[in-house]
C-alpha cells in the first residue's frame, strides 16, 4: 500500500493552504505540470521522490490561489475503483480539515493583520495591530478564544469542490500543454507550465472563489469596532452571501478574481525561475544527494517566491474587503497604487510572517495525522490539498 500512496513528505509538499496557500501553495500544486527533474530522481519514496525538496515546497500556501491549483493525490475512479476512490477522497477531506483547523488561528491572525487598514477605513477596527502577538491577544480578549477559528468552516468546505474540480480540469490542461523540457526546450516547457497551471487554477478558482471571499470576510469581521456598536457585520457564512449579493450582486463575491488568476502565473514563474537558477549552483556533488540540502533549497525557493508574490494576495484580499462598502477600488491596479501611495510598500507585506508560521503549523499537524492513519488503518490515505 505504501508504494501506492505518497509519504507525509510528499503529502505535505502538495498542501498548502497552505493551500492557498498565492497557495496558497504550489510548485506541483497546479494540475497537469511537469515537476522539476530533481524532484523525480535519486530519492526513492514509492512513486514519488526527493521528499526534502517537495516538503518545503508546500510550506508557503498563498491561500486559495495556490490551493485551487493543487494536483490530486487521490486517484480518479477509473484508475482504482469507486470504493477506494471514495475512501481516499473522504480521508483526504478529513486530513485537510485537520490541518486547516489546526492552523486556523494563525491564518485568521494573518488575515486580520493583512487587511487591518481596510477595516480601519470602514470603521470596523479601532486601532492597528502592533504585531502577531498583539493581534492574538486582542482577538482573544475582545472576541473569545473560539473566535480564532472564525471563517474556518468555509475554508474546510472548499476542499471538496476544489478536489472534484481538479479531477475535471487537470487532465485536460495536461494534454493541452504537454511540453517536455528535454524534447521541446526550456522556454516552451516553462511557458507550458505557466499556461497549464494558470488555466487549471483559474478554472477551479471560478467555482470556489466565493468561498474564499466569504472566509476572508468572516475572518476580518472583528467584534470590537466602533461601527455597529461592537457587534459583528456578518452572522455566519450564509449571511455573508446574503448581504454581499444584496449590496453588490454576484460581482461582489468575485471582487479580486482577475488579480488572483494573475497571481497563479506570477507565483509559478517565480518558483520555476528560481528553481532552475539555484538548483545547478547549490545542489552539486555530494549536496545533490543530501536530503537536508534539497529541503533547504525547497524552503528557500518556496518562501522566496511566496514573499515576492505576496503583494498580489494582499491586493486581492483588500479588494474583497470593499464589497458592501461605499468606496471601492476601480481595479487591482488602482488598489495597488492607492495602497502604495497612502500606506507605503510595507503595507503590501503585512501578515507575511504569520503566513509562514501557518504553513509550518499545518505541515506539522499533517505529519502527525498521517502517522495516526497508519496506526488506525494500517495505511496512508490520499491527502487533500486546497
From Swiss-Prot:
<keyword id="KW-0472">Membrane</keyword>
<feature type="repeat" description="Solcar 2">
    <location>
        <begin position="188"/>
        <end position="281"/>
    </location>
</feature>
<feature type="repeat" description="Solcar 3">
    <location>
        <begin position="289"/>
        <end position="375"/>
    </location>
</feature>
<feature type="transmembrane region" description="Helical; Name=3">
    <location>
        <begin position="186"/>
        <end position="206"/>
    </location>
</feature>
<keyword id="KW-0812">Transmembrane</keyword>
<dbReference type="Pfam" id="PF00153">
    <property type="entry name" value="Mito_carr"/>
</dbReference>
<feature type="transmembrane region" description="Helical; Name=5">
    <location>
        <begin position="292"/>
        <end position="312"/>
    </location>
</feature>
<dbReference type="GO" id="GO:0005471">
    <property type="term" value="F:ATP:ADP antiporter activity"/>
</dbReference>
<dbReference type="GO" id="GO:0005743">
    <property type="term" value="C:mitochondrial inner membrane"/>
</dbReference>
<feature type="transmembrane region" description="Helical; Name=4">
    <location>
        <begin position="257"/>
        <end position="278"/>
    </location>
</feature>
<keyword id="KW-0999">Mitochondrion inner membrane</keyword>
<dbReference type="InterPro" id="IPR018108">
    <property type="entry name" value="Mitochondrial_sb/sol_carrier"/>
</dbReference>
<keyword id="KW-0809">Transit peptide</keyword>
<dbReference type="GO" id="GO:0140021">
    <property type="term" value="P:mitochondrial ADP transmembrane transport"/>
</dbReference>
<feature type="binding site">
    <location>
        <position position="170"/>
    </location>
    <ligand>
        <name>ADP</name>
    </ligand>
</feature>
<dbReference type="GO" id="GO:1990544">
    <property type="term" value="P:mitochondrial ATP transmembrane transport"/>
</dbReference>
<keyword id="KW-1133">Transmembrane helix</keyword>
<dbReference type="InterPro" id="IPR002067">
    <property type="entry name" value="Mit_carrier"/>
</dbReference>
<comment type="similarity">
    <text>Belongs to the mitochondrial carrier (TC 2.A.29) family.</text>
</comment>
<keyword id="KW-0813">Transport</keyword>
<feature type="binding site">
    <location>
        <position position="158"/>
    </location>
    <ligand>
        <name>ADP</name>
    </ligand>
</feature>
<feature type="transmembrane region" description="Helical; Name=6">
    <location>
        <begin position="352"/>
        <end position="372"/>
    </location>
</feature>
<comment type="subunit">
    <text>Monomer.</text>
</comment>
<keyword id="KW-0496">Mitochondrion</keyword>
<feature type="transit peptide" description="Mitochondrion">
    <location>
        <begin position="1"/>
        <end position="76"/>
    </location>
</feature>
<feature type="transmembrane region" description="Helical; Name=1">
    <location>
        <begin position="85"/>
        <end position="112"/>
    </location>
</feature>
<dbReference type="InterPro" id="IPR023395">
    <property type="entry name" value="Mt_carrier_dom_sf"/>
</dbReference>
<feature type="region of interest" description="Important for transport activity">
    <location>
        <begin position="316"/>
        <end position="321"/>
    </location>
</feature>
<feature type="repeat" description="Solcar 1">
    <location>
        <begin position="83"/>
        <end position="176"/>
    </location>
</feature>
<feature type="short sequence motif" description="Nucleotide carrier signature motif">
    <location>
        <begin position="316"/>
        <end position="321"/>
    </location>
</feature>
<keyword id="KW-0677">Repeat</keyword>
<dbReference type="InterPro" id="IPR002113">
    <property type="entry name" value="ADT_euk_type"/>
</dbReference>
<feature type="binding site">
    <location>
        <position position="316"/>
    </location>
    <ligand>
        <name>ADP</name>
    </ligand>
</feature>
<comment type="function">
    <text>ADP:ATP antiporter that mediates import of ADP into the mitochondrial matrix for ATP synthesis, and export of ATP out to fuel the cell. Cycles between the cytoplasmic-open state (c-state) and the matrix-open state (m-state): operates by the alternating access mechanism with a single substrate-binding site intermittently exposed to either the cytosolic (c-state) or matrix (m-state) side of the inner mitochondrial membrane.</text>
</comment>
<feature type="transmembrane region" description="Helical; Name=2">
    <location>
        <begin position="153"/>
        <end position="177"/>
    </location>
</feature>
<keyword id="KW-0050">Antiport</keyword>
<protein>
    <recommendedName>
        <fullName>ADP,ATP carrier protein, mitochondrial</fullName>
    </recommendedName>
</protein>
